[in-house]
């Protein structure tokens, strides 16, 4: 079971909660993460199996509970059965229906069974269930923000349900995110452009519309890659001693590259997801701006990779496209080893991100900080989906497009002609469901072959690098 949540801490043990144990028997640990622990349990009143999710961050727990209640009742969204709020010394405990499998188990089982793989009729039923779950969330105004196969749980009889909504947000009925598309507002400054101080690697950034070169008339200072990495080392050293303003780095208007790049350089690039902690969640609550550092890299929309903090359900639709493509290929379509590599992989397939392909992209916080050589001949989605029919490629194209306003909704895709073609989707009871995974199963090693070599740095992924230092920070061009 996928683990969500943020930072914080309480007892870190469900066994010391008589309010919980008096109503639920704790049978054993089912999964564990930095910010949540999940236990198998049984309801004492009727013996029904349950999942007891102990969340070590009250903000994340409340957010998940609110999102689940907003989307209920839905056959394809996990049911929240009970909620035990935490206190000064206890964590929140969410009681959820027990679902022993997830969609990544289906993908792994099908990949192991090659060449028979996943029959088309079964694949269509899995796809329809994913679409129904996402459509239910979106109709309730919920943005999941971390859709991936591991967060799509499956019952033993094959019913798939959207789960792990610890990063979810509920869009307001009025205001920025509801009833007015964030990319279509007509104010002088695009809504995702930060009006407050942002930070790129600890360097203050001016408003994007004020070009430092134009203001000063001076050529920017040129840096070698070694100079750039030396500056990064100095910033890390300052950060260690608390000299970098942590609140600035965690501000809701700071971009994902601004807050995450040094970690990509420093740490294991296979660490696919950015840790969404409690402090970041509280800052979102206070500022009203979303953070761009949500979701898991392989499924993160381009606007998030470029630092957007004002977005809607369209980010889920990009993730949905990646998930459905994985059901076709039985492997991730964009398995980036770092955020920069992720953008590079997407561009190599879909082409250059420009105002023509993504209106308003030049206003994204990091658009003018990371540059790639122009791709003259992108390989296209057809090449990434070999031996697939036109209708199969079409459904992925409707989701994996740069312009968020052109991504098809999950509700629309439920009526896509592809699902009316032969072979028709099998009924749910006709699905071949893998055996339940062991408690200690760790799927990370299953995907180890998708690592980008042995590199542990964004910069090792590219041949040459042109680094420019300006008053805004660093501008990097990769070739």
UniProtKB/Swiss-Prot annotation:
GO terms for molecular function: ATP binding; cyclin-dependent protein kinase activating kinase activity; cyclin-dependent protein serine/threonine kinase activity; protein serine kinase activity; protein serine/threonine kinase activity; RNA polymerase II CTD heptapeptide repeat kinase activity. InterPro entries: CDK (IPR050108), Kinase-like_dom_sf (IPR011009), Prot_kinase_dom (IPR000719), Ser/Thr_kinase_AS (IPR008271). Residues 468-479 have a biased composition (Basic and acidic residues). The keyword Kinase applies. The keyword Cell cycle does not apply. Pfam families: Pkinase. It comes from the Eukaryota. GO terms for cellular component: nucleus. It is an enzyme of class 2 (transferase). Keywords: ATP-binding, Kinase, Nucleotide-binding, Phosphoprotein, Serine/threonine-protein kinase, Transferase. Residues 24-419 form the Protein kinase domain. Induction: By auxin. Down-regulated by cytokinin. The modification Phosphothreonine is found at residue 291. The active site is at 146 (proton acceptor). Its EC number is 2.7.11.22, 2.7.11.23. Residues 429-479 are annotated as: Disordered. Belongs to the protein kinase superfamily. CMGC Ser/Thr protein kinase family. CDC2/CDKX subfamily. This is Cyclin-dependent kinase F-1.
